[in-house]
Amino acid sequence: MIIRDVELVKIARTPGDYPPPLKGEVAFVGRSNVGKSSLLNALFNRKVAFVSKTPGKTRSINFYLVNSKYYFVDLPGYGYAKVSKKERMLWKRLVEDYFKNRWSLQMVFLLVDGRIPPQDSDFMMIEWMKSLNIPFTIVLTKMDKVKMSERAKKLEEHRKVFSRYGEYTIIPTSSVTGEGISELLDLISTLLKEN
């Protein structure tokens, strides 16, 4: 997929406040500070998504219109301890409404920090998506920070841990080096049937 143009067209803070569905969309979700905005910017090949040093900054669902046909959807980060219980409930209600009511959603990319073992909140997200029959692919982020000598071991550790939930594609990526970006775009292209 060649991304010719991208524009942030909607910031949804309440359930149902989404733009009309287009030909298709993919969504990105992960723990706070997993590198979601950086990965989106790498996919877009330009700085569109706001990158913050503060975890838990994205508290809305952000819809990016890509090539005037598709949405790339940035879901709020989860697992940040300093967020109040009320905010966590609002986040859950917003994301659950999106998952249940967005028929144009083809795939969720679950971003997991490749440097460390998956966290309990990652497993909870997997179980939640499985219970809602949401298709997902696991994307390991920040792989440039994993030593080359440890990469195969880290990948195998992640594969083994995630295998208890079934067989899932795992794509190692780095928004710094560009690793995995073209593979991710190819997969998205196939999902959205872009030629």
UniProtKB/Swiss-Prot annotation:
Record-listed GTP binding positions: 30-37, 56-60, 74-77, 141-144, 173-175
Gene: engB
Protein name per the record: Probable GTP-binding protein EngB
Residue ranges constituting the EngB-type G domain according to the UniProt record: 22-194
GO cellular component terms, semicolon-separated: cytosol
NCBIfam families per UniProt: GTPase_YsxC, small_GTP
GO annotation (BP), single: division septum assembly
Binding site for Mg(2+): 37, 58
Cofactor field: Mg(2+)
Pfam families named in the record: MMR_HSR1 (PF01926)
Protein source organism: Thermotoga sp. (strain RQ2)
